[in-house]
Amino acid sequence: MNRFDQYPLVGEYDVVVVGGGTAGFAAAASAARRGARTLLLEEKAYLGGTATGAQIGQLMGFADGEAAAPQKGILADVLSGLQAENGTDGIVSIYLCGRKDLEIQVIPYVPETLMRVIHRIVRAAGVEVLLHTRVIGVDTENGSISAVAFHNEQGIQRVRGKVVIDASFHGSVAADAGCRWQAGDENGVLQPGTLMYQMADVNQDAYAACTQPQRKEIALQGIA
C-alpha cells in the first residue's frame, strides 16, 4: 500500500505541474497548448512566483551575447501581453553599477500586470489550476511517480499524471520521489533571496554624479 492510497483520487492527467512560478506556468501552458490535459498546482493565491510576489520588476538576460535576441513562444506572449497593458517598455539595456561594460538586456515590468498576463496565458491554454494548494508528497511505483498528494480547503486529495513536472521552489517533489538532490554549492551556500522594493523622491542627479567607488559601495548595500 502506498502512503496516500487512503485519500480520494480526484483526477488523472497527462501532465501535472507542481509550482506556478515562471518555470511552472510556462511548462503547464506549453503542455496544454500541445493537447495534454494539464493540471497546475500552486500553494499561493497567484501565479508567477517571485517574479510577481517579490516585486522583482525585471526579467533578465534577453541577448544573444551582443544584442537583444528576438523572443519566441511563451516569452513572446508574456512580452506582448505586458505591452498591451502598458506594463513594460520592452527590452531595454541596463548597466550594473552604472558601468558600460556590465550591460545586460532586461524586460522591466509592473508585477501586478505580469500576474494578470500569466493568468490569462494559462487560462487561454486550457490549464486546470488549483491555487492555495500545497503538495505534501508523492507515491511511486517502479521508479516513477504514481500519484501526487496535496492539501487545500477540500482536505487531502491526490491526482495521477503520466508526467509530473517539479517546478516547486524547493524541488521537494523530486526529492520526495527519491531523486538525488543538492542544496547550494559544495559548501551548502545558497543564493540569497531577492525581495525588491520601490523608492520615491530619489535625487537622480546626485546619483548620476556618484563616482564609481561610491556606486560600488551602494551596490554592495544591495541598493543598486
Model-found features: residue ranges?
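Conserved N-terminal/central alpha/beta ligand/cofactor-binding core
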Residues: F4, S30, A36-R37, E42-G137, ...
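Beta1/beta-strand and adjacent pyrophosphate-binding region of the FAD-binding site
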Residues: Y7-G21
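Core beta-strand elements of the Rossmann-like FAD/NAD(P) dinucleotide-binding domain
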Residues: G11-Y13, Q154-V163
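Short hydrophobic core segments
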Residues: V18, V159-H170
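N-terminal Rossmann-fold NAD(P) dinucleotide-binding loop
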Residues: G24
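Short, solvent-exposed loop/turn and secondary-structure capping segments
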Residues: A28, G49-G53, A174-R180
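Conserved beta-strand-loop-beta-strand element in the redox core of flavoprotein oxidoreductases
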Residues: D139-R158
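Rossmann-like dinucleotide-binding core of oxidoreductases
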Residues: G171-A224
